[in-house]
Amino acid sequence: MNFVGIIAEYDPFHSGHALQLRMLRQQGASTIAVCMSTGVVQRGGVPILPEAVRVRAALAAGADLVVALPAPYANASAEQFAAAGVHLLAALGCDTLAFGAETPEPAPLQAAAAALCSAAFPAALRSQLESGLPFAAARAAAAETLCPGAADLLQTPNNILGIEYCKAILRQGAAMQLLPLPRLGAAHGTAQTGQVQGQALASASHIRQLVHTQGIKAASPFVPQAAMELYRQAAEQGQLADPEKFSTAVLTLLRTKTPEQLSTLRGAGEGLENRLYAAAREAETVNDLYDRLKTKRDPTARLRRLVLDAVLDVPAAGLPALPPYLLVLGAKRSALPLLKHAKIPAGTSLAGLAGQDQKLQIAADMHSKAVDFSLLCRYKIQPMGHAYTAHVVLL
């Protein structure tokens, strides 16, 4: 293990993330690169803090390099999210992929991934769906018929994402070893807290909830001191995400769309565009919108991502399947020479990358639009064009 990659959101960066970086150093990582969601996040929202703040927090805690997971690939299914992150880290030259998992051994995750990628899986899935099971349950049951034990692995959030990483490595033929790390302290997406090595830990979702209800100081027990200072400054400058502005912006933009426009979106179809069109005209808040769209068939996470795709006009066709560039958001100066060996266009300027060809321009423009939207949803609204003018963070 020499060059370790992590795919993360850092929404926000907290003490659990810092502990993970320390663990990797202790296990022999000489260089750590992070592929971080930018503009938007995988749950179909905007990050609580802007990219530069999260990048500085990660670098201060031990990361060597932070590259962007561009917005259209961040607001995506677990499969697409994982594929994009693996592609970027492999292109950067990482030899190991580290990730949190409830099952800290790679072999069971790899076996489940192989089953999901097998030629026999589509027929097995179809059989389970025809029995009336919802998609997630049908997928787990189908995987179980091909790989005993897979269904249990597909019940826990970190294992689910870990299996998607394994699938991406398998499909892309990426030369990366897997390093699952046990999730320490608080469980993913819960209000539980824990303590490891004398450090209080909480999930990112719990920290976001604390900040939204009690203010930025409430995050202090669960965030490294250096990061906390960055967060205080960001809060004072009005850079925190404002849920009410997000809600208003989403409904405002959705109400300008026609059913025809919505039908061209990524993830639309089967009448979803008509449901979205009708719900947007009745909903009073974005959470009300999600409730109106909800069905037993469609997971809430999928609907949240569809809503954000509609706001950002992400099309069903035209976007490259995988990110076509490596945009460095921040780095220790000693890590910058690694870019010379990248297998896809790499640099510190989005404008410079976008100008190289049409494919890069399309992806960059979609990313820039998402960053602009994110900055519209801050307590203090920021000017447009930030993605193209932002400076790399160097330490």
Regions found by a protein language model. Name each.
Residues 1-54:
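N-terminal catalytic cores of NTP/NDP-binding nucleotidyl/phosphoryl-transfer enzymes
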Residues 28, 62, 170-173:
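A broad structural signal for alpha-helix termini and local helix breaks/kinks
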Residues 30, 64, 95:
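Receiver (REC) domain switch/active-site residues of two-component response regulators
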Residues 56-70:
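A glycine-rich helix N-cap at a beta->alpha junction
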Residues 68-395:
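Active-site cores that bind ATP or allylic diphosphates and position pyrophosphate for catalysis
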